[in-house]
Amino acid sequence: MLNITLPDGSVRQYESPVTVAQIAASIGAGLAKAAVAGRVNGKLVDACDPIVEDSAVQIITPKDQEGIEIIRHSCAHLVGHAVKQLYPNAKMVIGPVIEEGFYYDIATEKPFTPEDVAAIEARMKELIAQDYDVVKIMTPRAEAIKIFQERGEEYKLRLIDDMPEVEAMGMYHHQEYVDMCRGPHVPNTRFLKNFKLTKLAGAYWRGDSNNEMLQRIYGTAWATKDELKAYIQRIEEAEKRDHRKLGKQLDLFHLQDEAPGMVFWHPKGWALWQVIEQHMRKELNAAGYKEVKTPQIMDKTFWEKSGHWENYKDNMFVTSSEKREYAVKPMNCPGHVQIFNNGLRSYRDLPMRLAEFGSCHRNEPSGALHGLMRVRGFVQDDAHIFCTEDQIVSEARAFNELLVRIYKQFGFHDVSVKLSLRPEQRAGSDDVWDKAEQGLREALTACGVEWGELPGEGAFYGPKIEYHVRDALGRSWQCGTLQLDFVLPERLDAEYVTENNDRARPVMLHRAILGSLERFIGILIENHAGSFPLWLAPVQLVIMNITENQADYCREVAAKLQAAGFRVELDLRNEKIGYKIRDNSQYRFPYQIVVGDKEKQENKVAVRRKAEDLGSLDLDDFIAQLQQEITDALVNH
């Protein structure tokens, strides 16, 4: 008999072997119907997999996050089933789960159309209605190869070639359709009813632009109809907030093919940029940072010494001149070490905080570029703190406090923290990495924050703390980082004179709050739907006259507001005031000011805020209200 321990601590006995499905059925009919898969001794398994030893078992249902991901993965296989029925010559590639959904890459003779995707979705619904069982068969390698050879699935054969150590693989049968996968998958298509195909895109085989282009069908799936409906509404709202769309509508920026991944900033967009940069400069100055500027192009030998050439070369733009090879900087850190090294440093100089709004370039694949969110040329609010090991915790705490305050100023109050650990390709010894990772754990503990850990996600020179903000749509964006680096000071020979008159290496803390300013602006646009808070808006007020009689007074109002530090636009066009109000509303200015004869005579302004009429206000009182609103946002949050 097998002893099966359930999550509540109870133990049940079964004849060996027993499956997760059988255990669920023995507990109750409701659980049997809801069982998607199981977790046996910590490992996810299919509901049909045999258990042959005493084990701890959890029944996975659609209420569990793992259950939702299994449903999504099974929906990807269902895409394959439908595609092969409708387009028999299509070749199936891969179909993984992604955040809140899934996709399947498919090789086709001609690209799919939106009408094709609609037909695929309709066929998927027909297949779900058949309520068929998904059958898993562990298949020897040679037999799996034969199956895919007979079906002409060349990409599946290539994937098998990538797994020479695998002797048998799970083959999941959706009626006549067969796909291979680690699993687990749902036992029946009844779990897949709440799905939607969402998008069609192109993708290169293995993500390499030198390879053939595939068709990628995206979709989502949920446990309930209401969850699916809520997701679709969220996606529709996200489309309305798309920073590329709003960037054009609000006249902030544009991109064009002649400069892939580079941004053309328009006056309003550059005004927004300047507000952000100047605000960050003020905050950094108050926090004890010194601003610097480093070259954008440096000799190849410099990058070899720093380790970037070995570990990051594929992402760097290179050029040559006068028989010397150069690279455009992808990061600011090595340049900051040069400033630290330019002079004899003492322990009394530490911590030294060097900040730069550094212009960097990275050779991102063209297929990965996406508006402001993924670019090739960008500016970071970068800074590096050179300190002693004893100062790591206090500097991390100070940085964490600064970061949280700034995020609140921008409207982000929900911040989560991740600790990214050593990647496979890295510089430095394991002892150095042990020391660095433990240092960041101690710093996080001192900050009093909870965090999750991400093995393999650190930079090549050190582990990093990642700060993720949650926007108005509930999406998570990784922006801030704090990285602990013992490697670069060693490679670039940074040192300081200790209290005992010895020489020692400083610890280097790489840190950013916004990350890429381009990307952060994209996040801000979508978070605020283009309706920026007063302090942040590129144009804070637009002033409109009703007739020519008020034009001079409008100019006086504008001058007084500008003298008080506000960003103002005048609209003195010879148009009806209703038209001007509607026309300016598309730019989502925080305030609209209307001036007629009455306002002119009484030295007042008629104020509208986001379509709300605030009435006629004394100009000086209104300016005081505006100043208080900004104080509340930046100081009182």
From Swiss-Prot:
Give GO BP annotations, semicolon-separated.
threonyl-tRNA aminoacylation
Note the InterPro entries from the entry. Answer: aa-tRNA-synt_IIb (IPR002314), aa-tRNA-synth_II (IPR006195), aa-tRNA-synth_II/BPL/LPL (IPR045864), Anticodon-bd (IPR004154), Anticodon-bd_dom_sf (IPR036621), Beta-grasp_dom_sf (IPR012675), TGS (IPR004095), TGS-like (IPR012676)
> Which Gene3D superfamilies did the record assign?
3.10.20.30, 3.30.54.20, Anticodon-binding domain, Bira Bifunctional Protein, Domain 2, Threonyl-trna Synthetase, Chain A, domain 2
Cite the PROSITE patterns for this sequence: AA_TRNA_LIGASE_II, TGS
Catalyzes what?
tRNA(Thr) + L-threonine + ATP = L-threonyl-tRNA(Thr) + AMP + diphosphate + H(+)
- Cofactor section: Zn(2+)
What enzyme category does the UniProt record give? ligase
Annotated segments matching region Catalytic: 242-533
Amino acids binding Zn(2+):
333, 384, 510
Where does this one sit in the cell? Cytoplasm
Report quaternary structure and partners.
Homodimer.
Q: What is this protein called?
A: Threonine--tRNA ligase
